[in-house]
């Protein structure tokens, strides 16, 4: 049986004179990137530059829309109506798409950021609104969302292209959601453990939740981070370990049809 997976990372998350992450370095290790669109991070110049660098590295690009929350980096919950959620996503998707077009490339996917991502994964009204927006904008854009979530299931039911995402360094609740960042078990800190978990998720479609329960999971894409040199080394180790274990690493557009 053949196994393959995408490696994705969030990039373009600086703002003005402030730089965040090691974008050029992480692009050497991943197959897809999620570019901030100006609301939780990023700005027009960073968005343009990020698209250029991704194209030079032959890495697929996706939009990474967040809530309008620069001070909270898009990680704080907001009360928004479904129509606001749809409009927020479309506004940012359209902005990044303009830079993609200007650089003669196309957006591969859309992945929400932070609180927007977590809330839309489980809140039906928000998920439906975001999916409505994708249908209005471009049905060929892949929707990357939390594995096993309502958004993933509903997107597939609608016939949209959906990539189910897992996290190399995050803990899982028994219901398949991510453990809150402020709670024990939120992060997998040992590289060897994280790599073993990732391989298990891909090959067995199972992961061990924080309570010890084995839960179902699908892994089309693995989210990794490139915040510092150690993180880059970790991602490089993940990629090499996947390949050594017979798992092909490639962009979503190559296998999500």
UniProtKB/Swiss-Prot annotation:
This is 5-oxoprolinase subunit A. Forms a complex composed of PxpA, PxpB and PxpC. NCBIfam families: PRK05406.1-3 (NF003814), PRK05406.1-5 (NF003816). One of its GO terms (molecular function) is 5-oxoprolinase (ATP-hydrolyzing) activity. Belongs to the LamB/PxpA family. It comes from the Bacteria. GO terms for biological process: carbohydrate metabolic process. It catalyses: 5-oxo-L-proline + ATP + 2 H2O = L-glutamate + ADP + phosphate + H(+). Its EC number is 3.5.2.9. Transmembrane segments: none annotated. InterPro entries: Glyco_hydro/deAcase_b/a-brl, LamB/YcsF/PxpA-like. Catalyzes the cleavage of 5-oxoproline to form L-glutamate coupled to the hydrolysis of ATP to ADP and inorganic phosphate. CDD domains: LamB_YcsF_like (cd10787). Keywords: ATP-binding, Hydrolase, Nucleotide-binding.
